[in-house]
């Protein structure tokens, strides 16, 4: 049973969401501020639902602190229209965001999509063949461990960042649409103002060292998508 840590200072909302997620088969822990969340967080937690606006320690500061020690998937719960919070959360390593008020079915679908990605990684570790390790320039991507190394040095990527990078490496030199990336990496259809994939690409550009062959890692093709640049 997957364990979810639900963090929101709205006690009525957390009660309703806990009831919903319990019915969906999840084991739900509840915290009402960031300090409580960090105290409850351990390796048994599979995913966090993290509200932005909270007392004591808000969601942004909580995310910043937990990313220093944990790569647990995080979905940020934001107020509708708070674009700055969404962008900042994604820059700090959130996997996705969901603006309030949200549809219960959409929340459950987002959770299951991210957990499926995590479980895929675990299955790679227990399968002899699994998906192959990919190499681009001095970058090596091991899907079994969800580990990215550049010139022998491990890169600190979130699970979503690794999945996005691996998918682009699988299509090296080919354009992959934002719609396809959103569906495969985040498990959701792309909406007109959804910038999550763009922010994850931006994070990868910031985290990846300069290539030895002098090429950029990615190219943006406006209206078409992204491609990972091949050496040739």
Swiss-Prot record:
Induction profile: Part of the putative cpxR-cpxA operon.
InterPro entries: CheY-like_superfamily, OmpR/PhoB-type_DNA-bd, Sig_transdc_resp-reg_receiver, WalR-like, WH-like_DNA-bd_sf
Effects seen without this gene: Deletion of cpxR in the CG43 strain significantly decreases expression of cpxA and cpxP. Increases mrkA and mrkH transcript levels. A double cpxR-cpxA mutant in the CG43 strain activates expression of pecS and pecM. Increases production of the major pilin of type 3 fimbriae MrkA as well as that of type 1 fimbriae FimA. Increases mannose-sensitive yeast agglutination activity and reduces biofilm formation in the CG43 strain. Increases promoter activities of fimA, fimB and mrkA, decreases ryhB and cpxP, but has no effect on fur.
Annotated Response regulatory domain residues: 3-115
Annotated GO CC locations: cytosol; protein-DNA complex
The organism's place on the tree of life at top rank: Bacteria
The entry's keywords: Activator, Cell adhesion, Cytoplasm, DNA-binding, Phosphoprotein, Stress response, Transcription, Transcription regulation, Two-component regulatory system
Post-translational note: Phosphorylated by CpxA.
The keyword Cytoplasm is assigned to this record: yes
DNA-binding region range list: 131-230
Protein location: Cytoplasm
GO biological process terms, semicolon-separated: cell adhesion; regulation of DNA-templated transcription
Activity modulation comment: The two-component system is activated by envelope stress such as overexpression of some (misfolded) periplasmic proteins.
Function in brief: Response regulator member of the two-component regulatory system CpxA/CpxR which responds to envelope stress response by activating or, in some cases, repressing expression of downstream genes. Binds to the promoter regions of various genes in vitro, including ompC, cpxP, ryhB and mrkA and, when CpxR is phosphorylated, pecO. Represses expression of the major pilin of type 3 fimbriae MrkA as well as that of type 1 fimbriae FimA. Repression of expression of MrkA appears to be indirect, mediated by activation of the iron homeostasis regulator RyhB.
Quaternary structure note: Interacts with cognate sensor kinase CpxA.
UniProt-recorded name of the protein: Transcriptional regulatory protein CpxR
Source species of the chain: Klebsiella pneumoniae subsp. pneumoniae (strain HS11286)
């Amino acid at each position: 049973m997957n364990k979810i840590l639900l963090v929101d200072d709205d006690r009525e909302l957390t009660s309703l969401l806990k009831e919903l997620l319990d019915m969906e088969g999840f084991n739900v822990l509840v915290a009402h501020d960031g300090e409580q969340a960090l105290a409850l967080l351990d390796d048994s937690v599979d995913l966090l639902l993290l509200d932005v606006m909270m007392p004591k320690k808000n969601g942004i500061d909580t995310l910043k602190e937990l990313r220093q020690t944990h790569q647990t998937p995080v979905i940020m719960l934001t107020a509708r229209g708070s674009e700055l919070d969404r962008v900042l959360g994604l820059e700090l390593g959130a996997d996705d965001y969901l603006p309030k008020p949200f549809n219960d079915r959409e929340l459950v679908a987002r959770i299951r999509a991210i957990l499926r990605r995590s479980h895929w990684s675990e299955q790679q570790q227990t399968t002899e063949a699994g998906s192959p390790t990919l190499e681009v320039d001095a970058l090596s991507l091991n899907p079994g461990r969800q580990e990215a190394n550049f010139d022998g040095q491990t890169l600190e990527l979130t699970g979503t960042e690794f999945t996005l990078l691996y998918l682009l490496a699988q299509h090296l030199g080919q354009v992959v649409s934002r719609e396809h990336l959103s569906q495969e990496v985040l498990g959701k259809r792309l909406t007109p103002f959804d910038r999550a994939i763009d922010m994850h690409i931006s994070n990868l550009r910031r985290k990846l060292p300069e290539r030895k062959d002098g090429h950029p890692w990615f190219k943006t093709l406006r209206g078409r998508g992204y491609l990972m640049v091949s050496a040739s």
